[in-house]
Amino acid sequence: MKYSIKAPAKINLSLDVIRKREDGYHEVEMIMTMVDLADRVDLSLRADGGISIDVSEGFVPSDERNFAYQAASLLKKRYNVREGVHIYITKRIPVAAGLAGGSSDAAATLKGLNELWQLGLSVDELATLGAEIGSDVSFCVYGGTALATGRGELIKPIASPPPLWVILAKPPIGLSTADVYNGLKLSEARHAKTAEMIAALERQDAASICALLHNTLEDVTLRLYPEVAHIKEQMKRFGANGVLMSGSGPTVFGIVEKESRVNRIYNGLRGFCDEVYAVRLIRTSGTCPNTDENGML
């Protein structure tokens, strides 16, 4: 028996770092939403009880370092599952991009194995398990649009944004999340207007959403990687209504209100950036529009 499920990418409409905690993590306040760029996770039962994983991209770990593998291992051990699983991930989300590709793959694996292994776990239970794997996994289990607090694992659903286009562009650079956080000086950091962003989402006010986009980590990344600043400048020049770096980067996204501008921005960025995507915001939780439905095969 097999199960196939989509794993959508996320972007941060707002990311604020509040303080560094005693456990080494940072206290954050983030507004995250999903876009219809998605990996595909195919799960196949193994009678021998083993866990194996293959990934379409060769530079993605295909062992216990992979979040999807960790998700399967956690479920199997926690609930004493005898059956094993083979996981095959078809990657479409750029790797190490600030788009939570690995976290979304883990969330999809948790949800898919809950069905395949007939565990009967609630979404809340799956999200709690996800927090043991990574900070973004809980959000990816819920999907939709949410306010994430704590280290990112405390999730509160909020209003989804209006149906806008999003252009994603990832420069060809390697980025260390640890370096970005280490370079952050909280005493000098600019902070997000989180409550105002939530209110703008509730009003479906696209202009205010674009104006309130904020990422406290962005100034650090722009200082370390000028290529990211260049992409931001070009997106604005080509006509994006709002531009921001997602997560710790390096991917930059532009929100576009008018469909007529999408091709101009996309084609303009393709001139100097190989990984460019034109996508839509997902307004419902769980699955991706315009993709195969999740389910048993």
Swiss-Prot record:
**Known function:** Catalyzes the phosphorylation of the position 2 hydroxy group of 4-diphosphocytidyl-2C-methyl-D-erythritol.
Regarding protein family, the annotation reads:
Belongs to the GHMP kinase family. IspE subfamily.
**Binding of ATP: at which residues?**
94-104
Identify a single GO molecular function assigned to this protein. 4-(cytidine 5'-diphospho)-2-C-methyl-D-erythritol kinase activity
Q: Which UniProt keywords are listed?
A: ATP-binding, Isoprene biosynthesis, Kinase, Nucleotide-binding, Transferase
Query: Which EC class is the enzyme in?
Result: transferase
Q: What is this protein called?
A: 4-diphosphocytidyl-2-C-methyl-D-erythritol kinase
Task: Identify the gene encoding this protein.
Answer: ispE
Q: Which SUPFAM superfamilies match?
A: GHMP Kinase, C-terminal domain, Ribosomal protein S5 domain 2-like
**Catalytic activity entry:** 4-CDP-2-C-methyl-D-erythritol + ATP = 4-CDP-2-C-methyl-D-erythritol 2-phosphate + ADP + H(+)
Per the UniProt entry, the Enzyme Commission number(s) are 2.7.1.148
Q: Which Pfam families match?
A: GHMP_kinases_C, GHMP_kinases_N
InterPro entries referenced in this protein's UniProt entry, alphabetically: GHMP_kinase_C_dom (IPR013750), GHMP_kinase_C_sf (IPR036554), GHMP_kinase_N_dom (IPR006204), IspE (IPR004424), Ribosomal_Su5_D2-typ_SF (IPR020568), Ribsml_uS5_D2-typ_fold_subgr (IPR014721)
Q: Where is the active site?
A: 10, 136
**Which GO biological process annotations does it have?**
isopentenyl diphosphate biosynthetic process, methylerythritol 4-phosphate pathway; terpenoid biosynthetic process
Q: In which pathway does it act?
A: Isoprenoid biosynthesis; isopentenyl diphosphate biosynthesis via DXP pathway; isopentenyl diphosphate from 1-deoxy-D-xylulose 5-phosphate: step 3/6
